[in-house]
């Protein structure tokens, strides 16, 4: 071996390439074996994670979160003092796109509002639907939103007037106050009906967000029967009523006039007469077809249906609530068109009127989704965010 190392130049000088088939076959086999050995070693290297056998979790750093943040700090959802999540649904690199659903869990006084909701509201980068259990958020953030963020041009530069002052873009502020109705704007669910499909959606919204009374309240038959009657009456109001009659108050009035007599199956109440007249004019009217299905019930059954309807809608008979729902000022369908802040003020100790807010939220989400899909091709011009306060079951 020592001789070979000392005289390597002489040995290599004498080597000549051989084209003998045995020599060539030996070389090919040797090359294949060498390649297999290299491949096996690389393969094993992929399976082994030396030094992290017990896990590789670690705390993230600024470089880890950076791809998920917008370069414009005002277009982020603040999570901590140094971490945030971009509001952009389509970032430059799609692999960093994330949904914007965030859950914050904490007890009373833990800072959910102070350290998450308020900083997010102060970004003023979208429309907001804010559940305000104590009515304090609108007092603390209202003036700021009324002034609005600085207006920017197409290039992202802050706009100024001729005198050099910054031009602001004020928010449209809406309030539904179920603690003090005298400080609330009006909300009329009928204002957002455009077709028969919307009537069915409204009926579902009413059923889901209110509750009946008694043993029959949760039985499928009675709920479906109630839906038939609500659908017929709401369709009649929307198609045949005057503009000032298109509200829940008229629905309650029609229910009050829908008397039935068990001993007299031929008795006609004022509502029966109205539908009979409508049927004579238009036998295929949507309201008529729904009402005829409801009228298949016998006198005793029809009376039970009316009692269920009356129990479900009883809270709407309160004078203050009737006034609130007489016409609409909310303009829910425009929240995705312009920067709007909708404050839903509710009591955190009394849930009596929470169903009103639940109805509004159900209708709002349906409206915005439909408008995004049908009008804007899937994306609203202004991003809309909901800050909802929920109590976890114990």
Short names for language-model regions:
Residues 1-110, 114-117, 152-162, 349:
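Basic- and hydrophobic-enriched, low-structure N-terminal and domain-boundary segments
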Residues 98-390, 394:
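P-loop NTPase motor domains
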């Amino acid at each position: 071996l020592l001789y070979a190392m000392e005289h390597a130049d002489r040995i290599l000088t004498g080597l000549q390439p051989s084209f003998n088939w045995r020599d060539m076959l030996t070389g090919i086999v040797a090359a294949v074996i060498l390649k297999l050995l290299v491949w096996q070693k690389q393969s094993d290297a992929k399976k082994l994670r030396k030094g992290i056998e017990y896990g590789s979790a670690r705390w993230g750093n600024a470089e880890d979160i950076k791809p998920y943040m917008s370069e414009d700090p005002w277009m982020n959802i603040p999570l901590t003092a140094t971490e945030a999540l971009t509001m952009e649904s389509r970032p430059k690199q799609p692999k960093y796109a994330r949904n914007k659903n965030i859950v914050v869990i904490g007890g009373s006084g833990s800072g959910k509002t102070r350290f998450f909701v308020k900083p997010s509201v102060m970004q003023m980068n979208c429309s907001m639907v804010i559940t305000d259990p104590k009515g304090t958020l609108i007092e603390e953030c209202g003036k700021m939103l009324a002034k609005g963020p600085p207006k920017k041009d197409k290039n992202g530069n802050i706009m100024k007037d001729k005198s050099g002052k910054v031009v602001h873009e004020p928010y449209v502020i809406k309030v539904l106050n179920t603690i003090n109705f005298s400080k609330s704007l009006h909300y009329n669910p009928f204002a957002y009906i455009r077709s028969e499909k919307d009537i069915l959606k409204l009926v579902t919204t009413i059923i889901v967000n209110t509750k009946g009374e008694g043993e029959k309240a949760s039985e499928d038959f009675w709920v479906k029967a109630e839906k038939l009657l609500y659908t017929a009456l709401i369709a009649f109001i929307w198609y045949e009523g005057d503009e000032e009659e298109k509200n829940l108050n008229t629905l309650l009035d029609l229910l009050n006039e829908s008397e039935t007599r068990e001993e007299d199956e031929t008795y006609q109440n004022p509502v029966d007469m109205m539908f009979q007249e409508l049927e004579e004019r238009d036998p295929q009217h949507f309201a008529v077809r729904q009402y005829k299905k409801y009228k298949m019930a016998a006198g005793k059954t029809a009376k039970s249906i009316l009692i269920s309807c009356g129990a479900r809608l009883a809270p709407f008979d309160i004078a203050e609530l009737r006034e609130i729902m007489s016409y609409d000022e909310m303009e829910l369908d425009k929240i995705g068109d312009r920067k709007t802040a909708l404050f839903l003020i509710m009591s955190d100790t009394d849930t009596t009127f929470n169903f009103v807010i639940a109805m509004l939220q159900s209708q709002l989400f349906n409206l915005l989704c439909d408008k995004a899909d049908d009008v804007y091709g899937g994306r609203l011009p202004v991003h809309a965010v909901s800050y909802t306060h929920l109590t976890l079951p114990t």
